[in-house]
């Protein structure tokens, strides 16, 4: 089983995501845009267990994944991704809570890939976050002018916490 250390920082946006994405499309830095549906198993202690479906809008088949993510503080977390087929994903997703839906757009700036997430659930409309993965915890980072407050250390911005705020009747797959 592959185990990764994810080193990531997260921020609010100072400008609407639509403006940033349009600018990136115009200057050639826009890489990819796709939709993510993810849900979480009820609290399991040390690990957060996520079911994720990534939808590429007809450009390629959806992908399915189960991820175990170690809870903790700081910007580095152990992550264990497990590829699933559609049936495995459906079985896992039925055990999970409400589905968090977001559109992710990847933008290349310098030597970093910035991932802008626009949340699609009615309860989260207006929430727009950007994440960037780093090669090490002490890696330098030049922030674009559209990056605002850092939310890395604020638990209420973690996807698993956002999913808890969704109504129970949100679709389960």
Which residues are covered by each model-predicted region?
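Phosphate-end processing signature that detects enzymes handling 5′-triphosphorylated RNA
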Residues: 1-173
């Amino acid at each position: 089983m592959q185990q990764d250390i994810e080193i990531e920082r997260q921020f609010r946006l100072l400008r609407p995501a639509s403006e940033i994405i349009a600018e990136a499309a115009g200057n050639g830095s826009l890489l990819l845009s796709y939709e993510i549906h993810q849900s979480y198993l009820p609290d399991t202690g040390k690990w957060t267990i996520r079911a994720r479906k990534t939808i590429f809008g007809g450009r390629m088949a959806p992908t399915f994944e189960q991820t175990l993510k170690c809870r903790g503080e700081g910007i580095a977390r152990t992550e264990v991704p497990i590829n699933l087929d559609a049936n495995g994903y459906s079985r896992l997703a039925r055990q999970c809570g409400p589905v968090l839906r977001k559109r992710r757009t990847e933008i290349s700036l310098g030597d970093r890939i910035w991932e802008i997430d626009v949340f699609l659930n009615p309860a989260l409309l207006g929430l727009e976050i950007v994440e960037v993965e780093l090669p090490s915890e002490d890696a330098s980072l030049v922030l674009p002018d559209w990056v605002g407050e850092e939310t890395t250390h604020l638990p209420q911005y973690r996807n698993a916490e956002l999913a808890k705020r969704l109504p129970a009747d949100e679709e389960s797959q």
